[in-house]
């Protein structure tokens, strides 16, 4: 394949001026062969396997970054959901396992480790319940462990007992971690995917290989710049510009993933196409939507613009790689997107509008700060609403919500780094307590009649 000099310059500009980077190289590790009835032995086995397989990940990322001139921001590990791995111990707490994950991840130098997780879309085993009840203390006593709960799916419906427990767990975590920061490391899913490289929702699915490389790219700034420099007038032309730009972004991610797999001698799994923003100016999904013609993200037309963006990214990415997977779309994390932050502060981007946007984008209600006084049943109601969108539309949806103790609407909270900062957003005054407390399961939807 011949490469034009203009294409080389274009790639250099993507990195130098438009905040393009490979957001993460994530190694997924299967822990089934670590299982032991003795929790101390289990912890020892887990530590040994993670540090053995992941020991060269950080150094490999540095070598590839230097070789190709592409920043590789994070190196991460995802593991088999711990509720499955720890069941044989019959322990009443899995906090020590979270602490083992934390130690192992720090020993090899990665930025996060995911998989302190439970899959409870149809029901909770005793081990699932122990894990979920361990989450608050696990988040309090670890630094880089991430947790997730899958509470629903299109085939199983929504487990409302798990939704209720998830709301209580998030509320408890907010109460015992500074400014609710522990909640930034907890995601509640409907239709969770098994090969997600992004945190905080990554875990290594049971259908995966013993170890696998998954890569996530990030290029909102590149897409925005392409739109601003194009002659596109109609939305058809806008979609074409986004599609072609996504192709270029994806090719870089594919190259890095294949090279990393070769160097680490671990199979290449998937490339996640998701446009992942940061709080930096020029790296915002919201600003892409505004470049399409919206005065501010959150105004009328925002959901349509996001649908166009999400679909065009997928179409361009699928042409560039045969290994597309994960979540693959556009993320809309409020605290991690400079444009979303500004729109939320202006009052135009609301929780209701974000919920509508999640019906057409990559994941769901992400990194949203709410008043610390928000009751657990309200959090559960928000989770149930979001799960319903995912269940009915056969897509992944998720909630990462942070009740900030001691703060109310009009104030903001600073998380720092990639997590950014967020204005406290209002929640509805009415109560869903009776509804949430009913428990049971919302049945899976009929598939033949789609309206």
UniProtKB/Swiss-Prot annotation:
Q: Which Pfam families match?
A: DUF711
Family listed: Belongs to the UPF0210 family.
Assembly, per entry: Homodimer.
Q: Which PANTHER family match?
A: UPF0210 PROTEIN MJ1665, UPF0210 PROTEIN SPR0218
What is the protein name for this chain?
A: UPF0210 protein APP7_1551
The taxonomy runs: Bacteria, Pseudomonadati, Pseudomonadota, Gammaproteobacteria, Pasteurellales
């Amino acid at each position: 394949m011949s490469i034009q000099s203009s294409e080389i310059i274009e790639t250099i500009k993507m990195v130098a001026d438009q905040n393009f980077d490979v957001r993460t190289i994530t190694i997924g590790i299967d822990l089934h062969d670590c299982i032991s009835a003795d929790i101390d032995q289990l912890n020892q086995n887990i530590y040994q396997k993670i540090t053995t397989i992941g020991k060269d990940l950080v150094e490999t990322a540095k070598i590839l970054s230097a070789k190709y001139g592409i920043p590789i921001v994070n190196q991460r590990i995802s593991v088999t959901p711990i509720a499955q791995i720890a069941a044989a111990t019959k322990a009443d707490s899995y906090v020590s396992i979270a602490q083992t994950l934390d130690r192992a991840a720090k020993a090899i130098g990665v930025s996060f480790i995911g998989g302190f997780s439970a899959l409870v879309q149809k029901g909770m085993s005793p081990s699932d319940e122990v894990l979920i009840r361990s989450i608050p203390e696990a988040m309090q006593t670890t630094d880089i462990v991430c947790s997730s709960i899958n509470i629903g799916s299109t085939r199983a419906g929504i487990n409302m007992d798990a939704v209720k427990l998830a709301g209580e767990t998030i509320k408890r975590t907010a109460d015992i971690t500074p400014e609710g920061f522990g909640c930034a490391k907890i995601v509640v899913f409907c239709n969770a995917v098994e090969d997600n490289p992004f945190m905080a929702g990554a875990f290594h699915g049971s259908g995966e290989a013993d170890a696998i490389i998954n890569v996530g790219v990030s290029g909102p700034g590149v897409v925005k710049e392409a739109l601003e420099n194009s002659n596109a007038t109609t939305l058809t032309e806008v979609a074409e510009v986004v599609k072609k730009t996504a192709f270029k972004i994806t090719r870089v991610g594919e190259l890095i993933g294949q090279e990393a797999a070769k160097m680490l001698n671990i199979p290449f799994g998937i490339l996640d196409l998701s446009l992942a923003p940061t709080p930096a100016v020029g790296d915002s999904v919201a600003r892409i939507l505004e470049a399409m013609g919206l005065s501010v993200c959150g105004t009328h037309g925002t959901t349509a613009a996001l649908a166009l963006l999400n679909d065009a990214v997928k179409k361009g990415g699928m042409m560039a790689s045969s290994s597309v997977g994960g979540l693959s779309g556009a993320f809309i994390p409020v605290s991690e997107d400079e444009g979303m932050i500004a729109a939320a502060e202006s009052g135009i981007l609301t929780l209701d509008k974000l919920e509508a946007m999640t019906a057409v984008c990559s994941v769901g209600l992400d990194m949203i700060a709410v008043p610390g006084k928000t009751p657990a049943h309200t959090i559960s109601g928000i989770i149930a609403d979001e799960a319903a969108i995912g269940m009915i539309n056969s897509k992944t949806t998720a909630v990462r919500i942070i009740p900030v103790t001691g703060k109310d609407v009009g104030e903001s909270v600073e998380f720092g780094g990639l997590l950014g900062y967020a204005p406290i957003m209002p929640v509805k005054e009415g109560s869903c307590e009776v509804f949430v407390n009913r428990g049971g399961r919302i049945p899976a939807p009929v598939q033949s009649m789609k309206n």
